[in-house]
Amino acid sequence: MHTVFYVSDGTAITAEVFGHAVLSQFPLVFEQVTIPFVETLEKARQVRARIDEQFRQTGLRPILFHTIVDPLVREEVLKAQASGHDFLNTFVSPLEQELGVKAEPRLHRTHGMENRKLYDDRIEAVNFALANDDGITTKEYEEADIILIGVSRCGKTPTSLYLALQFGIRAANYPFIEQDMGALVLPTALKANRHKLFGLTITPQRLHEIRNQRRANSRYSSLEQCEQELASVERLFRQEAIRFLDTSSHSVEEISAKILEATGMRRQLY
């Protein structure tokens, strides 16, 4: 099994994202190691030694994805017995020529606190998502950018938090529960913010599997209950002309991207 190292003088998030995107094209399993904050020559030598040791143990040259600003630190890491792939410098040189401007590399610029306001906005969005999770309160819905609605366990909470953390979007979410199903209508708080509503749904079988992990062999997790709840909620979505998305086979990243595409909400990139 090949070992993949993600090495950076910052958080290594960029190296991980780039590396994961590339490696997903191959039908292989990799052992993955992330090493952030390699900011000194001493740390670089330790990383080099670790990579070389992995090569000696496995006989397979490790794959190295790196984003290192300091050229001396980068050169030391690249002395390792690995297949090195530099995400940043691959694109920086062509862009310098195109833009006619010399790049000014700086540590922690990508995922640091270069723009304090954007960082604060993101943290506030996360706090908002937590405070308005699962219908805890509906008093702050006027401040929401979006309100996700759907049955319990269809992906509302993780999507709300991802939208907040990744894009600084204030996302609330509201669950429809078994007691609502007899005569399902939009609650007053949702009606007042109807233009912010976005529905999430899921297949009955997938919902049954997820709920069964939480409350096995209960009415809540039974396939019949899942089918009934989903039928009622999807009927409401159609009656009220609320846009909705099936989350069954999508990751939280994909769900979020599809919501942004459908709503046209502005992304705040960090």
UniProtKB/Swiss-Prot annotation:
Keyword flag Nucleotide-binding: yes
Enzyme Commission number, as recorded: 2.7.11.33, 2.7.4.28
Keywords per UniProt: Kinase, Nucleotide-binding, Serine/threonine-protein kinase, Transferase
Catalytic activity: [pyruvate, water dikinase] + ADP = [pyruvate, water dikinase]-phosphate + AMP + H(+); [pyruvate, water dikinase]-phosphate + phosphate + H(+) = [pyruvate, water dikinase] + diphosphate
Pfam families listed in its UniProt record: Kinase-PPPase
Domain of life according to the entry: Bacteria
Residues bound to ADP: G150, V151, S152, R153, C154, G155, K156, T157
Disulfide-bond pairs as recorded: none
GO MF term set: ADP binding; ATP binding; phosphotransferase activity, phosphate group as acceptor; protein serine/threonine kinase activity
UniProt entry tagged with the keyword Cell division: no
InterPro entries, per database record: Kinase-pyrophosphorylase, PSRP
Function: Bifunctional serine/threonine kinase and phosphorylase involved in the regulation of the phosphoenolpyruvate synthase (PEPS) by catalyzing its phosphorylation/dephosphorylation.
Similarity section: Belongs to the pyruvate, phosphate/water dikinase regulatory protein family. PSRP subfamily.
Record protein name field: Putative phosphoenolpyruvate synthase regulatory protein
